[in-house]
Amino acid sequence: MMEMDGQQSAHGESYAYTSPYWAEFYDMWVEEIIGSAALTKDDDFFFNLLSPFLPNSTRVRGPLRVVDMATGTGRVIRGILQKMNSRAQGELPGDIQKELEIWGIDHSQAMINRAKGLLEDKMKPSTTIVWRTSAAANFVDENPELRNAVDLLIFAAGSIGHLTAHGERRKFLQQVVKALRITNPPQTPRSIAAISILKPDDGLQENCSEQHVAGKEVRFNAEMRKPSRQWPHLEYCKSETMTLKDKGILVNSFDLKIVETATGKLLSQEKYSWSLQVFSQTEWERELSDCGLSISQKVETGSETWYILHLANKKSLV
Ligand SMILES: C[S@@+](CC[C@H](N)C(=O)[O-])C[C@H]1O[C@@H](n2cnc3c(N)ncnc32)[C@H](O)[C@@H]1O
């Protein structure tokens, strides 16, 4: 099957998310930039997206199915499970947990491996997590079990900006329309896709569009040094990020050094990159409507604008 994947074709082996070192450093970097208080608020937000579906324990059409698109190191899934577990002490009937199936999908095997490692010891036998390495633009075609079978899809951290190939975002939205379960409100809650766009001055993906002049490099984030937990004898040193704007695409690149802590010896130094599409609200809302998705709500959180989407009446548009 032909895959459409802007990051893999633009960056190849230097694409940051293919590196197991970056996979570990990513979590430290996010915590530093976003802050642990804001990350905890995100967990509440993710759980609140799920809660309307929870009282519906008598399901006729299989489990309550959640897709975490571009799951990365599984931050969204960990947030949901932590909240589920704390509520489960009191309020949630056990059969609801058994019926919950969460899919973590990402095109990077390195990120999925880390997500699995972080989640394995937290999982209860009642939780089903399905991991898949698939590109966003093909995720239903590659996993046909998801067709008309997803109650909630979450695409966090503005990662939709990574769909930079021509037509890639539209192709992803068409997959979302195939995935969302056709429901019968008010008996069953309407299936939803929650997709976030980063606010322009967010630090996470150096997405400061106004500050960029075509062809001119801009520097973001100071150098960051952190010890590895996975490889305790090593430490990371990330350089500041260089950002170059070219035809509506921001290309971010940086060096990641791996240093032996005891001796200070430099073991490796790689240049990594990714790219992001500069967001245009008009274009985005036109694509949503062309693909058959309606906006139920827009929600502002700390650094993201969330679009809560449902199927427009005529699903046949795709
Ligand atoms: C900024 S991280 C977000 C990770 C996680 N969702 C979070 O909130 O922390 C971006 C993720 O998007 C993934 N990604 C980028 N483009 C993708 C694509 N076309 N298909 C699937 N995953 C993609 C990357 O591999 C990476 O794990």
What function would you assign to each model-found segment?
Residues 191-283:
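SAM-dependent methyltransferase
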Residues 75-139:
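Class I SAM-dependent methyltransferase SAM/SAH-binding core
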Residues 274-318:
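C-terminal lobe and adjacent flexible extensions of AdoMet/dcAdoMet transferase-like proteins
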Residues 2-65, 75, 79, 83:
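Conserved class I S-adenosyl-L-methionine
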Residues 142-152:
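A short acidic, Gly/Pro-enriched loop at the edge of an enzyme's catalytic core
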Residues 150-168:
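A short SAM/SAH-binding and catalytic strip from SAM-dependent methyltransferases
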Residues 170-189:
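A short glycine-rich, Lys/Arg-flanked "PGG" loop and its adjoining helix->strand segment in the class I
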Residues 70-74:
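Class I SAM-dependent methyltransferase "Motif I" SAM/SAH-binding loop
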